[in-house]
Design a protein with these regions (language model features):
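Hydrophobic anchor at the beta1->P-loop junction of P-loop NTPases
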Residues: 5
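A glycine- and Lys/Arg-enriched "phosphate-lid" helix/loop adjacent to the NTP-binding pocket
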Residues: 90-140
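NTP-dependent small-molecule kinase module
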Residues: 127-182
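Conserved substrate/cofactor phosphate-moiety recognition/catalytic segment
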Residues: 18, 22-61
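Glycine-rich phosphate-binding loop used to anchor ATP phosphates in small-molecule kinases
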Residues: 49-94
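P-loop (Walker A) phosphate-binding loop of NTP-binding proteins
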Residues: 8
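Walker A/P-loop
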Residues: 14
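ATP-binding Walker
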Residues: 11
Length: 182
Protein backbone atom coordinates (compact mmCIF):
# COMPACT_ATOMS: atom_id res chain seq x y z
CA UNK A 1 0.00 0.00 0.00
CA UNK A 2 1.22 3.49 -0.86
CA UNK A 3 0.30 6.28 1.57
CA UNK A 4 0.97 10.02 1.57
CA UNK A 5 0.74 12.24 4.65
CA UNK A 6 0.75 15.96 3.87
CA UNK A 7 -0.14 19.32 5.35
CA UNK A 8 1.49 22.60 6.27
CA UNK A 9 4.99 22.74 7.71
CA UNK A 10 4.74 22.01 11.41
CA UNK A 11 1.40 20.18 11.20
CA UNK A 12 2.93 16.84 12.22
CA UNK A 13 3.22 14.90 8.96
CA UNK A 14 6.72 13.56 9.61
CA UNK A 15 5.97 12.73 13.24
CA UNK A 16 2.88 10.73 12.26
CA UNK A 17 4.68 8.93 9.43
CA UNK A 18 7.53 7.92 11.76
CA UNK A 19 5.03 6.62 14.30
CA UNK A 20 3.25 4.54 11.66
CA UNK A 21 6.59 3.16 10.48
CA UNK A 22 7.38 2.16 14.08
CA UNK A 23 4.10 0.23 14.41
CA UNK A 24 3.88 -1.43 10.97
CA UNK A 25 5.91 -2.86 8.11
CA UNK A 26 5.67 0.48 6.26
CA UNK A 27 8.86 2.22 5.20
CA UNK A 28 8.85 5.99 5.76
CA UNK A 29 10.24 8.36 3.14
CA UNK A 30 10.29 12.11 3.85
CA UNK A 31 10.16 14.44 0.84
CA UNK A 32 12.59 16.85 2.52
CA UNK A 33 15.29 14.17 2.14
CA UNK A 34 14.77 14.33 -1.64
CA UNK A 35 13.96 18.04 -1.98
CA UNK A 36 17.03 19.51 -0.24
CA UNK A 37 20.74 18.92 -0.74
CA UNK A 38 22.61 17.91 2.39
CA UNK A 39 24.12 21.20 3.56
CA UNK A 40 25.22 22.76 6.82
CA UNK A 41 23.12 24.53 7.87
CA UNK A 42 20.35 22.37 6.34
CA UNK A 43 17.63 23.37 3.88
CA UNK A 44 19.72 25.83 1.89
CA UNK A 45 19.87 24.35 -1.61
CA UNK A 46 17.11 22.60 -3.56
CA UNK A 47 17.65 19.49 -5.66
CA UNK A 48 16.33 19.89 -9.25
CA UNK A 49 12.83 18.45 -9.78
CA UNK A 50 13.82 15.73 -12.27
CA UNK A 51 16.60 14.51 -9.99
CA UNK A 52 14.48 14.45 -6.83
CA UNK A 53 11.65 12.67 -8.66
CA UNK A 54 14.07 10.05 -9.98
CA UNK A 55 15.45 9.25 -6.52
CA UNK A 56 12.10 9.31 -4.74
CA UNK A 57 10.48 7.09 -7.38
CA UNK A 58 13.32 4.58 -7.12
CA UNK A 59 12.92 4.33 -3.35
CA UNK A 60 9.11 4.44 -3.56
CA UNK A 61 9.06 1.44 -5.91
CA UNK A 62 11.42 -0.65 -3.75
CA UNK A 63 8.81 -1.27 -1.08
CA UNK A 64 5.38 -2.86 -1.03
CA UNK A 65 4.24 -0.67 1.88
CA UNK A 66 5.56 2.87 1.88
CA UNK A 67 4.46 6.06 3.59
CA UNK A 68 5.66 9.41 2.31
CA UNK A 69 5.50 12.53 4.45
CA UNK A 70 5.46 16.01 2.98
CA UNK A 71 3.75 18.11 0.37
CA UNK A 72 4.03 16.86 -3.21
CA UNK A 73 1.84 19.47 -4.89
CA UNK A 74 4.70 20.75 -7.04
CA UNK A 75 6.30 17.37 -7.81
CA UNK A 76 4.28 16.56 -10.94
CA UNK A 77 0.90 15.16 -11.98
CA UNK A 78 2.11 11.55 -11.90
CA UNK A 79 2.07 11.65 -8.08
CA UNK A 80 -1.68 12.38 -8.11
CA UNK A 81 -2.51 8.82 -9.18
CA UNK A 82 0.13 6.76 -7.39
CA UNK A 83 -1.22 6.59 -3.82
CA UNK A 84 -3.81 4.28 -2.27
CA UNK A 85 -4.47 6.68 0.59
CA UNK A 86 -3.66 10.33 1.29
CA UNK A 87 -3.84 11.78 4.78
CA UNK A 88 -4.21 15.53 5.18
CA UNK A 89 -3.31 16.99 8.56
CA UNK A 90 -4.58 20.45 9.39
CA UNK A 91 -3.46 22.35 12.46
CA UNK A 92 -4.44 25.88 13.42
CA UNK A 93 -1.87 28.49 12.50
CA UNK A 94 -1.02 29.64 16.04
CA UNK A 95 -0.14 26.14 17.28
CA UNK A 96 1.70 25.30 14.07
CA UNK A 97 3.83 28.43 14.18
CA UNK A 98 4.66 27.77 17.84
CA UNK A 99 5.85 24.27 16.89
CA UNK A 100 7.91 25.62 14.01
CA UNK A 101 9.59 28.24 16.17
CA UNK A 102 10.46 25.59 18.77
CA UNK A 103 11.82 23.36 16.01
CA UNK A 104 13.99 26.18 14.68
CA UNK A 105 15.39 26.78 18.19
CA UNK A 106 16.13 23.07 18.56
CA UNK A 107 17.67 22.78 15.08
CA UNK A 108 19.97 25.79 15.28
CA UNK A 109 20.50 26.30 19.02
CA UNK A 110 22.52 29.40 19.90
CA UNK A 111 23.26 30.05 16.21
CA UNK A 112 19.65 31.20 15.86
CA UNK A 113 20.63 34.20 18.00
CA UNK A 114 24.25 34.71 16.94
CA UNK A 115 24.55 33.80 13.24
CA UNK A 116 23.07 36.46 10.95
CA UNK A 117 22.65 34.10 7.96
CA UNK A 118 20.80 31.52 10.07
CA UNK A 119 18.63 34.29 11.54
CA UNK A 120 17.71 35.50 8.05
CA UNK A 121 17.06 31.98 6.76
CA UNK A 122 14.93 31.08 9.79
CA UNK A 123 12.94 34.33 9.60
CA UNK A 124 12.31 33.83 5.87
CA UNK A 125 11.14 30.25 6.52
CA UNK A 126 8.84 31.25 9.39
CA UNK A 127 7.41 34.16 7.37
CA UNK A 128 6.77 31.76 4.46
CA UNK A 129 5.15 29.15 6.74
CA UNK A 130 2.96 31.80 8.36
CA UNK A 131 1.33 32.52 4.97
CA UNK A 132 -0.17 29.00 4.71
CA UNK A 133 -3.75 30.07 5.46
CA UNK A 134 -3.57 33.23 3.33
CA UNK A 135 -5.82 32.49 0.30
CA UNK A 136 -3.82 34.91 -1.87
CA UNK A 137 -0.44 33.34 -1.09
CA UNK A 138 1.24 31.83 -4.16
CA UNK A 139 3.39 29.30 -2.24
CA UNK A 140 2.29 26.18 -0.40
CA UNK A 141 -1.05 27.07 1.13
CA UNK A 142 -4.24 25.62 2.52
CA UNK A 143 -6.07 26.72 -0.64
CA UNK A 144 -3.55 24.93 -2.87
CA UNK A 145 -3.71 21.79 -0.72
CA UNK A 146 -7.52 21.80 -0.77
CA UNK A 147 -7.53 22.09 -4.56
CA UNK A 148 -4.82 19.44 -4.92
CA UNK A 149 -6.82 16.99 -2.79
CA UNK A 150 -9.56 17.14 -5.41
CA UNK A 151 -7.13 15.92 -8.06
CA UNK A 152 -5.91 12.90 -6.08
CA UNK A 153 -7.00 9.52 -7.36
CA UNK A 154 -7.34 7.96 -3.91
CA UNK A 155 -9.22 8.27 -0.66
CA UNK A 156 -8.27 11.33 1.42
CA UNK A 157 -8.45 11.03 5.19
CA UNK A 158 -8.52 14.38 6.99
CA UNK A 159 -7.05 14.57 10.47
CA UNK A 160 -7.13 17.35 13.03
CA UNK A 161 -3.52 18.08 13.97
CA UNK A 162 -4.54 18.80 17.58
CA UNK A 163 -5.38 15.13 18.16
CA UNK A 164 -2.78 13.38 20.27
CA UNK A 165 -0.30 11.29 18.30
CA UNK A 166 -1.65 7.99 19.64
CA UNK A 167 -5.17 8.80 18.40
CA UNK A 168 -3.93 10.00 15.00
CA UNK A 169 -1.90 6.81 14.63
CA UNK A 170 -4.84 4.60 15.58
CA UNK A 171 -7.11 6.43 13.13
CA UNK A 172 -4.64 5.93 10.27
CA UNK A 173 -3.93 2.29 11.15
CA UNK A 174 -7.66 1.57 11.29
CA UNK A 175 -8.10 3.11 7.85
CA UNK A 176 -5.14 1.16 6.43
CA UNK A 177 -6.47 -2.10 7.91
CA UNK A 178 -9.98 -1.42 6.57
CA UNK A 179 -8.58 -0.77 3.10
CA UNK A 180 -6.37 -3.87 3.21
CA UNK A 181 -9.29 -6.14 4.09
CA UNK A 182 -11.85 -4.72 1.66
Amino acid sequence: MKVLIFGASGSGTTTLAKEIEKNTDFVHLDVDDYYWKKTEPPFQEKIPLTERNKYLKADFQKYKNVIISGSMVSWGKEWETIFDLAIFIHLDNEERMHRLYQREKQRYGEKLYTDQKIQQTSKAFLDWANEYENPDFEGRSLKIHMNWMESLDCKVLRINGKMILKNKTEKVLTEINNMATS
